[in-house]
Amino acid sequence: IILAGTNDIARNTGYISLENIFGNIVSMCELAKLYKIQPVLCSVLPCEKYPHRDNIEPADMIIELNEMLKNYAKKNKYIYVDYHSALKNEYNGLPAEYTKDGLHPNKECYKIMKEILLDALK
């Protein structure tokens, strides 16, 4: 299960383009396949604002990256777990009841994510 990208969008280790973030995730999938592991790609969770990076507006970048991931998963016949569509609010962020800081899921959110994942794996 590959759920990655939000820390790169937040530029936690410096700037990285969406294309390079996507390329890194593709590399993870290729490594998994090399070792006979079937990748399961997950969308990046919704986030309107990063609490530690108020100069970055991630919502649109997350949507764009998720579209790239969804298309890649479809092309390669990988399972795609769309957390974003199921969890986003009207601002493309996590609803307040699912997070303390707008970024990290809380226990209630993880329960919902579990069900979304199990449903996708059926």
Where are these regions (language model features)?
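Alpha-helical cap/lid subdomain in secreted, periplasmic
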Residues: 1-122
